[in-house]
From Swiss-Prot:
Disulfide bonds: none
Taxonomy of the source species: Eukaryota, Metazoa, Ecdysozoa, Arthropoda, Hexapoda
Tissue: Expressed by the venom secretory cell of the spine. The spine is a cuticular structure containing a single large nucleated venom-secreting cell at its base. It is an independent unit capable of producing, storing and injecting venom. On the back of D.vulnerans caterpillars, spines are grouped together by 50 to 100 to form scoli, of which there are eight in D.vulnerans.
Annotated source species: Doratifera vulnerans
Signal sequence, start to end: 1-22
Protein name per the record: Z-limacoditoxin(1)-Dv4
Localization terms from the record: Secreted
Similarity remark: Belongs to the limacoditoxin-1 (ACP-like) family.
Miscellaneous remark of the record: Extremely abundant peptide in the venom (almost one-quarter of all toxin-encoding transcripts, and the highest represented peptide by proteomics methods).
Role: Potently activates insect GPCR. More precisely, it activates the ACP receptor (ACPR) from the mosquito A.aegypti (EC(50)=3.07 nM) with a potency comparable to that of the endogenous ligand. Has no activity on receptors of the closely related neuropeptides adipokinetic hormone and corazonin. In vivo, does not reveal any observable effects when injected into crickets (A.domesticus). Does not induce increase in intracellular calcium in mouse DRG neurons, suggesting that it does not induce pain.
GO function terms (MF aspect): toxin activity
Length: 35
């Protein structure tokens, strides 16, 4: 149950974070861990 819930939770969390920070763009300059 949790194995299927966790990825969905992460996607929702990431989406809400992106919506809360409109200046963040997922361009070629964006990489995991880069701020």
């Amino acid at each position: 149950m949790k194995k299927t819930f966790l990825p969905i939770f992460l996607v929702i969390l990431l989406a809400s974070y992106a919506l809360g920070n409109p200046q963040i763009t997922f361009s070629k300059d964006w990489r995991p861990g880069k701020k």
